[in-house]
């Protein structure tokens, strides 16, 4: 069953998923979904294991993903969703040029409660404006 799911991802031109390796172990995943080459847009998301969070890995992942999306892939807009109960991640995205575009009220059921989801987006030119802050930290490739 899992092999079939993985094969479907490999053959899906609208989805790309990568494992996040940290200290030689898979510690999460990063994905581009809803890739639309006509409109040059995509949605992106990532997950880090609890033991990897707070170690700067999220910033590296975001930088590398933005470089790929706006560089090699030629996208012009990326979107993401974050639970409003996770302000640290919202702030991190904003440092990379993302802007709050809206809120989906009570959109997710988590821990038995309805939770709001923040909708964020960044355009290629906004990433270019923010990018210089990160190239010294993360390099250019």
Language-model segments: residues:
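Active-site rim helix/loop that mediates acceptor-substrate recognition in acyltransferases
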Residues: 1-15
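Acyl-donor (CoA/ACP) binding surface of acyl/acetyltransferases
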Residues: 17, 21-141
């Amino acid at each position: 069953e899992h092999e079939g799911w993985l094969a479907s991802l490999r053959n899906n031109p609208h989805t790309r998923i990568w494992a996040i390796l940290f200290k030689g172990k898979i510690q999460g995943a990063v994905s581009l979904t809803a890739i639309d080459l006509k409109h040059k847009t995509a949605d992106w998301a990532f997950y880090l294991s609890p033991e990897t969070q707070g170690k700067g890995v999220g910033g590296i992942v975001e930088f590398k993903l933005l470089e790929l999306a706006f560089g090699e892939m030629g996208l012009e807009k990326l979107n993401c969703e974050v639970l409003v109960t996770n302000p640290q991640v919202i702030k991190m995205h904003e440092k990379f040029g993302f802007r709050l575009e809206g809120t989906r009220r009570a959109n997710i059921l988590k821990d038995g409660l309805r939770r709001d989801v923040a909708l964020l987006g960044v355009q290629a030119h906004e990433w270019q404006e923010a990018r210089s802050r990160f190239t010294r930290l993360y390099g250019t490739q």
